[in-house]
Design a protein with these regions (language model features):
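N-terminal secretory signal peptides that target proteins for export/translocation
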Residues: 1-12
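Bacterial N-terminal signal peptides
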Residues: 13-26
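Compositionally biased, intrinsically disordered or flexible polar/acidic segments
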Residues: 29-223, 390
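Conserved beta-strand scaffold positions in the cores of enzyme catalytic domains, especially
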Residues: 36, 243-245, 353-356
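Short, flexible loop segments at the rims of nucleotide/cofactor-binding pockets, characterized by
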Residues: 90, 251-256, 333-334
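Short, structured coil segments at secondary-structure junctions
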Residues: 128-130, 237-239, 311, 352
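Conserved SGNH/GDSL esterase-like catalytic core that processes O-acyl groups on lipids
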Residues: 180-182, 190-196, 202-212, 217-307, ...
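Alpha-helical cap/lid subdomain in secreted, periplasmic
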Residues: 260-429, 437, 448, 457-462
């Protein structure tokens, strides 16, 4: 069994693979304040820090505590979540992963984390909300402590005029109880040898918010092994940019608006914020009279653009990546399935003077570089019994695993550099350059899996 804590003499204890949830009521947060946590046992916390022991379960009256650890079984909101521990077998439940909760309201937050261990090397990946990657592979040497910071968005489904967005319920899963829409900011501490020394959370009032509207290929997928590029994109930005990924599986431009998701974005948008728009997979299935890439699709894109500009925001179009289309390759690349929608988006970009990130074109280069057989490594293609409860093979040519999502996020980051130069200034210096015709090797991308596994729950859309 992995211990929750790494041994050491440093006054603040190191947490192993910890998922931290910030829940929304108990600390009386009518006005946001700074929260500082020091995880220790048998020692006094630093001045101004809250001491929490690993044996302390979440207590709503206190507003913080563990929802799950090696000594605290799953309780309360974690059990009721749609990623709840049904997939956590007894063998996986002793990994040292734990969940910690503390109250915060909706908004953007700057998160500062001190990494390190007095006697051992550490390697930590940070995820937020539904597996949103914030920091990748932060490494320290024995006795070394480093501080990394990022800005994260926390949202609620409530609309200002009353009511909520149109939350979905599918296969027994309630979107309203997902980590994207509940009362929590979720931070998952993962990696080969995680080491977190302390944590500070501060409301961020001046951050740029990068909103995303899209479908299952973009969204923060709550369950392994499914991934969207929008859940990887935050890891490429420096503190001061919060990615608010409102994309949802199964949606098209018209249904995203019908479910009041665009309205929610516009309510939260401030001048200078961005909305990245990627649809096409599900718009293609619209059989209503007059529907099509050069009619309703273009009209809906223009409607979004107008609404964003009225709020002082900056719209950016992203053409839909191609499906792998594994049974239909010609001349070494997949036959196109979304070419008309990509062309229509490019036309709208030119007509409306809106930046267009051509992910469709870049994705074809990416798949072609891997080859027909090799490209399965970017998608959810796995033999039976790869994941808990998965008794049948998975062969999905639409939805991506973490490697595929990571490579597409790199494509989007490259598109930002060429098409959205002001936002590109906020990319991390080590983002580097990326050519999809020369992608990273699949084995070189190591994003540790979360415990929230749902291999038998395919996202809506195709």
């Amino acid at each position: 069994m992995c211990s929750l804590f790494l041994p050491g003499t440093h006054s603040r204890v190191i947490i192993l693979q910890t998922m931290i949830l910030f829940v929304g009521a108990g600390l009386g947060l009518a006005a946001p304040t700074e929260f500082r946590f020091d995880f220790g046992s048998g020692v006094q916390p630093r001045p101004g820090f809250v001491k929490v022991t690993p044996q302390q379960p979440y207590d709503a009256s206190k507003g913080y505590g563990f929802l799950q650890s090696d000594t605290v079984p799953p309780v309360g909101i974690l059990t009721n979540s749609n990623i709840a521990v049904a997939a956590v077998t007894p063998a996986r439940a002793t990994t040292g992963i734990s969940t910690f909760a503390v109250d915060v309201p909706e908004g953007n937050y700057d998160v500062s984390i001190v990494f390190g261990n007095p006697t051992e090397p550490t390697s930590t990946t940070i995820k937020a909300e539904s597996r949103r990657v914030m920091l990748q592979k932060v490494e320290t040497k024995p006795g070394q402590f480093v501080t990394n910071s990022f800005t994260v968005n926390v949202r609620r489904p409530n609309l200002r005029g009353g009511g909520t967005i149109g939350l979905r319920n599918k296969d027994g899963q309630s979107e309203g109880s997902s980590l994207d829409w509940d009362d929590h900011l979720t931070l998952e501490f993962n990696g080969s040898h995680p080491g977190v020394d302390s944590l500070t959370v501060t409301p961020s009032t001046n951050a740029i918010t990068l909103f995303i509207a899209g479908d299952s290929t973009v969204c923060d997928q709550p369950l392994e092994p499914w991934s969207g590029w929008g859940m990887i994109l935050p890891s490429f930005f420096s503190q001061g940019v919060a990615v608010a990924n409102h994309a949802q599986s199964g949606l098209a431009l018209f249904s995203f608006e019908q479910q009041r998701r665009l309205k929610k974005i516009l309510e939260e948008m401030h001048p200078g914020d961005y909305l990245f728009i990627q649809f096409g997979h599900n718009d293609q299935k619209d059989k209503s009279p007059g529907a099509g890439p050069y009619t309703s699709y273009k009209d809906n894109l223009k409607k979004y653009i107008t609404a964003v500009r009225e709020k002082g925001g900056i719209p950016v179009l992203v053409t839909s990546m191609e499906r792998r289309n594994g049974k239909n390759w010609k001349d070494g690349k997949p036959e196109p399935t979304l070419a008309d929608f990509a062309t229509a988006a490019r036309q709208v970009g030119e007509e409306e003077k809106v930046p267009v990130i051509d992910l469709n074109e870049m994705s074809v280069k990416f798949y072609t570089a891997l080859g027909n057989e090799g490209s399965v490594k970017a998608f959810v293609h796995y033999p039976a019994n790869t994941f808990p409860g998965q008794d049948k093979p998975l062969a999905d040519d639409t939805h991506f695993n973490s490697y595929g999502a990571y490579e597409l996020a790199r494509c989007v980051a490259e598109g930002i550099k060429s098409k959205v130069p002001e936002l590109a200034k906020k990319l991390l210096p080590d983002t580097g350059t990326f050519d999809p015709a020369h992608p990273d090797a699949p084995d070189s991308v190591q994003i540790p899996a979360s415990l929230s596994v749902g291999a038998n729950v395919k996202p809506a859309g195709s």
